């Protein structure tokens, strides 16, 4: 056998894909943004509140200004593939963080294959991908919490390599 065996505990997978739309105001615009996310994922989105008042933008503290959805499993791979197709499978190296996560934005949701509805309008959105290896839950669970070793963590280089291998992506400087 010439093929090298791979340790299943070292394989990297998507822990979750977070899709975020900031409407910058509560009310009808936020509801329309929530409708777009619901059409895209089939899940009910959650609203996010502003942390502080920014007078120049007209945002008050605790005002609902954004919606987001967390997707995991097979659906996360499908949505990520669709979003990367819009970006032509090219990401900047600065999109990757040191802890193995990466994110990028899309300017128009109609590029993802959703039909344009004049009542909704056009929204841009951000995609954040959190990568993990098996055993990551050890550091998150409530009972018998422990540290994850350095070999088991996902770093920026691992995330870049995973992106290039799984999606045949291109890293741009």
From Swiss-Prot:
Domain of life: Eukaryota
A single BP term in Gene Ontology: translation
Major subcellular location class: nucleus
UniProt xrefs under Pfam families: Ribosomal_L5, Ribosomal_L5_C
SUPFAM superfamilies, alphabetized: RL5-like
Keywords: Cytoplasm, Nucleus, Ribonucleoprotein, Ribosomal protein, RNA-binding, rRNA-binding
Record carries keyword Signal: no
Family the UniProt entry places it in: Belongs to the universal ribosomal protein uL5 family.
Function: Component of the ribosome, a large ribonucleoprotein complex responsible for the synthesis of proteins in the cell. The small ribosomal subunit (SSU) binds messenger RNAs (mRNAs) and translates the encoded message by selecting cognate aminoacyl-transfer RNA (tRNA) molecules. The large subunit (LSU) contains the ribosomal catalytic site termed the peptidyl transferase center (PTC), which catalyzes the formation of peptide bonds, thereby polymerizing the amino acids delivered by tRNAs into a polypeptide chain.
Protein name per Swiss-Prot or TrEMBL: Large ribosomal subunit protein uL5
Organism this protein belongs to: Encephalitozoon cuniculi (strain GB-M1)
Gene it is expressed from: RPL11
